[in-house]
Amino acid sequence: MIQVLLKYYSGMTPIKTAESHVVEALAALAQAQRLRAFRALVVAGSEGLTPSALAALLQIAPSALSFHLKALSHAGLVSAEASGRNLIYRAEFARMNDLLTYLTQDCCQGQSCAVVPEATQACC
């Protein structure tokens, strides 16, 4: 087992950049309000939500939501697009899928395991 791990971690140079992005994304999601906001945007799909609709849905102050959306945006998990006088926030599904792929890519050292295949399939 240790030899397999040493072999895996011996070529860390290209992974370091990926790891820093993963750590940044997980850190952004490691706060209850941000996690709820991200999940709400995932549910909203490609239509996205305005900050006011998202704040009402989550029952949090718009100023607090703004802080959380900035953190999620900085981590690349959400994007904002101007639509008239409003901003529309959307989950970045490609980033989310990259994160899930990174977390599960070497599951069980390539052997079959108890991971449910549907749980690791990409979304959207």
Say what each PLM segment does.
Residues 56, 73-74:
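Alpha-helical residues within the helix-turn-helix
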Residues 16-61, 83-95:
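N-terminal helix-turn-helix DNA-binding core of bacterial DNA-binding proteins
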Residues 69-70:
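Short, hydrophobic-biased segments on the C-terminal half of alpha helices
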Residues 81-83, 113:
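Conserved catalytic-core motifs of GNAT/GCN5-like acyltransferases
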Residues 1-21, 42-43, 93-124:
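Amphipathic alpha-helical dimerization/coiled-coil segments
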